[in-house]
Amino acid sequence: MKPSIVAKLEALHERHEEVQALLGDAQTIADQERFRALSREYAQLSDVSRCFTDWQQVQEDIETAQMMLDDPEMREMAQDELREAKEKSEQLEQQLQVLLLPKDPDDERNAFLEVRAGTGGDEAALFAGDLFRMYSRYAEARRWRVEIMSASEGEHGGYKEIIAKISGDGVYGRLKFESGGHRVQRVPATESQGRIHTSACTVAVMPELPDAELPDINPADLRIDTFRSSGAGGQHVNTTDSAIRITHLPTGIVVECQDERSQHKNKAKALSVLGARIHAAEMAKRQQAEASTRRNLLGSGDRSDRNRTYNFPQGRVTDHRINLTLYRLDEVMEGKLDMLIEPIIQEHQADQLAALSEQE
């Protein structure tokens, strides 16, 4: 391992020990905000520190085994130990490289999830409903909270469009690679001939930004319309114009919110989604510039980004970005998404490592 990387790891290990000491200090415990910030930092440094300690121990084992090679009686055992220690050292170095990769500051944030029915009419709306249920199950398993912000139901079930806020630890980091096109191949319930139809939905995942980081939106750039909400919401839901539609004139982005009975609450929710969408559009522009030189696994939420195909007759799901095919569609639709999410995160990390080695 390069001396510069070892020096960086030593500094992080020292900081980990320093933070551990601070967390036991009475003054720190009394200051709740500082205590929380240090607890987060401690958790972030723990894996690096533990892995680096293991690596240091293995270097000592290698040194000891090399010294034993000079002893004829110990040579054979020393050679075995040396081979094992070198293999372990390589594994730990790879782990440390991944742990040192630059973190996306948005990864720990809550996220807005949008699922939109694309081509395929009623069947696309039904599939949008299935996708939303799949993500809700995944969120439930991870103890995340799902709050529907806006929903437009399909005529025969499912959703033409649904927007939800998902809150919890590391939501955006886990879900961000879901953005893009999702295609389904199956026999619709309305199909009497048993023919397989292909429909599509688009998914967009955007980080929820704190107020201080939301893009500056000029009120003059907004057109705000009110209308009577439709759908679920109790007996009083249709009696007032509580639903809100906000159009951002410079970008043409439109956000509707009709989930709350209060117009004020709907407006606040719609503005937070609008801010996230504008931020996501700006991010997509930057990513397009980067993608011209390097492939980008992070979809734009556009239909042309084909992420996955869900083939029901064959029980197959394929992720086209990394050529991964699994015959476990039933489990995936029940929210067991880690088998698809983990490989793409690993592929993304491999791309980051390749980019770093090119820079060096």
Swiss-Prot record:
InterPro entries: PCRF (IPR005139), Pep_chain_release_fac_I (IPR000352), Pep_chain_release_fac_I_sf (IPR045853), Prokaryotic/Mito_RF (IPR050057), RF-1 (IPR004373). It is found in: Cytoplasm. It comes from the Bacteria. One of its GO terms (biological process) is translational termination. The keyword Transcription does not apply. Keywords: Cytoplasm, Methylation, Protein biosynthesis. One of its GO terms (cellular component) is cytosol. HAMAP family: Rel_fac_1. Peptide chain release factor 1 directs the termination of translation in response to the peptide chain termination codons UAG and UAA. Belongs to the prokaryotic/mitochondrial release factor family. This is Peptide chain release factor RF1. It comes from Escherichia coli (strain K12). The gene is prfA.
